[in-house]
Amino acid sequence: AWVYDPEREQRPIVLLAGSAEEASELRDHFVRVGIDNVTGYITSLDGLDLVTPKLVKPEELGTFEHTLLLDVRNKTEFAAGHLPEAVNISGGRVLWALDQLPNNGTIVTYCQSGVRNSIAASVLRSQGYDVVELEGSYLGWVAVSGNTPVTEPDLIEAA
């Protein structure tokens, strides 16, 4: 649900799968959650155009022209520490929060280490936004700025 809204999306889905059997099983999972326009599968990315995302280094962010600095981590991570002037929309909600984003200009995105960010940035690009990813994400910025990184609290056993 991070990258696909079945109510708005009309493009057919092609799955990346190891075999026809695996593709069929994956299609069944999609159908169970209301996504029924899976039309085929591929077994390799060979021959496909791959996008190399634009990046901005943490030390260049202060002089880099952008309209919005978007933190796609969860609310708890954001509350524990974030980049100055950042706006928080969890990566899993970006597709449903497009009305909160500027129509023009460049959006710089980041998460904790870069994984969720790459997904959220890809979603925004698919919707026509100009997106630049913060190299190293939050942890990269922390390393350059000297700020204390946010760490996840240990899980405790429930009684």
Residue locations for each model-derived region?
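Rhodanese-like catalytic fold shared by cysteine-dependent sulfurtransferases
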Residues: 1-159
